[in-house]
Amino acid sequence: MLITVQNGTGLHAPTDLAVLVTCEESPLPTEVAELLEATDHRGRFKQTTLLYPRGTLAPRRLLLLGLGKLATVTPDGLRQVAALAVQQARELQVATCTLSLQAHLTLPPAVVGQALAEGLELGAYRYQRYKTGLSSEQSFAVEGVTLYTSADEAALHVGVTTGQTVARATCFARDLANGPPNSITPAALGQAAQELGQRTGLRVTVLEPPQLVEQGFGGILAVGQGSANPPRFIVLEYGQPAADQPTLCLVGKGVTFDTGGISIKSADKMDEMKMDMSGAAAVLGTMQAVAELGLPQHVVGLVCAAENMPSATAYRPGDIITTLSGKTVEVLNTDAEGRIVLADGLFYAQRYKPQAIIDLATLTGAIVVALGQHATGLMSSDQALADQLIRAGETTGERVWQMPLWSEYREAMESDIADLKNAGGRYGGALTAAGFLAAFVGDYPWCHLDIAGTAWVERSLKPYQPWGATGVGVRLLVELLRSYGQ
């Protein structure tokens, strides 16, 4: 989508559709107000009124789109309104439209531009790769939007450029997580990473089973040993270590399909377990955005990719695994596989001596019970890092909620016959899972993001968030990296 920025109102520019964003306290332009037979458009948040102008107004159609009260406008509100605008344009089969925002917002123009661009790009997203025989109406896409503003045009343009970069990276992550498991295998994730490196200049290394065996990736190998699609460990590196810039490691769970293994899941909704690599997708998307934005930090993305299948060669309840760290793990439940692959990835991250390690994983159903689908669970060994993620969540709308990581949760994962066990009982499952992971991060500042409730939705929760994969984590992590240390 081409998004351009101009000064003015856009009400006198010929177009098939002009979208005028309105606020509750702001009067409509006189020539617009005259079109309303009753004062039924009050600018309430997400309120829409479609008009067919006459007189001096040039657009064929005019959509009034409410933003709510000026005092309560947030970047996420702008994001949602922009998504509604592009969806209305698509419904009307309008290829290019204008969006006018004349309200005097207290938000910086760059923030406004970024939020609007994200809303337009994310709101336009649809996953139709495997649809055949689509009609022109079904495949129709909006090609361009001109933003009209009374604010600083240059600053708004900077924000738009950033927003499009971040949104496209989010859509890349959505595509990976929406992809069918016969297509998105561990090898396919490795190929996607290599292609990403070719596009962006990221340095990419993909370790295959012989190298995993040689180097001792016992966790990833165990989870993947029951599948005909062998596991991979993927390293993506941006920038170089520097005395004046931090190194941050992002670790993603990449279980490309999770049957539960020998501890097999029920058939109901097992098809959705293709999204169990959403953490890996978020890492790949974030690394794309980091490279395209040219951020100053040294950032390393690590993807632990495996397929968890039941077979004669699958790992079993009762097995004891030796992980990359040398720590041993007693397997009580093969469906608690995410923490086992992450154990190798988190320990591997320590070799970079990072200022922060952040992992993302669709790890537990327990976090969904606790927080639903509106917040990602956050558990951390470092409060300063957690606070930065909380702020980034408020800015991006990818909100996180901090849960405790007390020593009792770590102790609950101790085994009688190995160093650790991979299941901690019925209660506090998200917390004991984090307690398990804590054993593999050393003394480095670390945050664990359990995205099991936010990575996939069965219905649209926000206009820019369609059903299916949400791409959660990309915008959150990019915001953290852009503001890191501030």
Residue map of PLM features:
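Short amphipathic alpha-helical segment within the helicase RecA-like ATPase core
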Residues: 1-254
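A generic structural signal for tightly packed, nonpolar segments enriched in small/aliphatic residues
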Residues: 190-486
